[in-house]
């Protein structure tokens, strides 16, 4: 029997919605990264974009363990002396709290062209509203998967 290798006609993308309220950031990011890559499917093919479209809501209510809210995110503007930093707490309280989840998922994917393509299938919203009701997404309950996924 030959090893199965998927073709574009074999790929079936679903829409999945995940509520991030009270869920630990790293555990959520690893589940989302697995879904984006398509590794949960038995027909997984490493060089194809087989993953589902994932919608994450309530990104501003994400939880972190320990003192991770005080850890810094660093970036460089490209200009001399342009190193910038902000704590995760400042980002979550700012205008774009979904960037914390976006960065965590991005860093759990391999750094290649395919993962950049797969990141376009991820949509993150700070609040509970999202414009994807027409796609009728399935609810994936991350909280009930494992008791360690939540933090009170």
Curated annotation (Swiss-Prot):
GO terms for molecular function: mRNA binding; structural constituent of ribosome. InterPro entries: Ribosomal_uL13 (IPR005822), Ribosomal_uL13_bac-type (IPR005823), Ribosomal_uL13_CS (IPR023563), Ribosomal_uL13_sf (IPR036899). GO terms for biological process: negative regulation of translation; translation. It comes from the Bacteria. Keywords: Ribonucleoprotein, Ribosomal protein. The keyword Transcription regulation does not apply. It holds the Pfam family Ribosomal_L13. PANTHER family: LARGE RIBOSOMAL SUBUNIT PROTEIN UL13M, RIBOSOMAL PROTEIN L13. Part of the 50S ribosomal subunit. This protein is one of the early assembly proteins of the 50S ribosomal subunit, although it is not seen to bind rRNA by itself. It is important during the early stages of 50S assembly. HAMAP family: Ribosomal_uL13. One of its GO terms (cellular component) is cytosolic large ribosomal subunit. It comes from Ruegeria sp. (strain TM1040) (Silicibacter sp.). CDD domains: Ribosomal_L13. The keyword Acetylation does not apply. Residues 129-152 are annotated as: Disordered. This is Large ribosomal subunit protein uL13.
């Amino acid at each position: 029997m030959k090893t199965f290798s998927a073709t574009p006609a074999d790929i079936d993308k679903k829409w999945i919605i995940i509520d991030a309220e009270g869920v630990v950031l790293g555990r959520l990011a690893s589940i989302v990264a697995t879904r984006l890559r398509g590794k949960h499917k038995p027909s997984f093919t490493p060089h194809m974009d087989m993953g589902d479209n994932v919608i994450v809501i309530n990104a501003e209510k994400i939880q972190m363990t320990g003192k991770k809210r005080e850890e810094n995110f660093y970036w460089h503007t490209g200009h001399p002396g342009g190193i910038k930093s902000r704590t995760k707490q400042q980002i979550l309280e700012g205008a774009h709290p979904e960037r914390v989840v976006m960065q965590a998922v991005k860093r759990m994917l391999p750094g290649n062209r395919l993962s950049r393509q797969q990141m376009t299938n991820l949509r993150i919203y700070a609040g509970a509203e999202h414009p994807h009701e027409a796609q009728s997404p399935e609810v994936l309950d991350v909280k009930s998967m494992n008791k360690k996924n939540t933090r009170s």
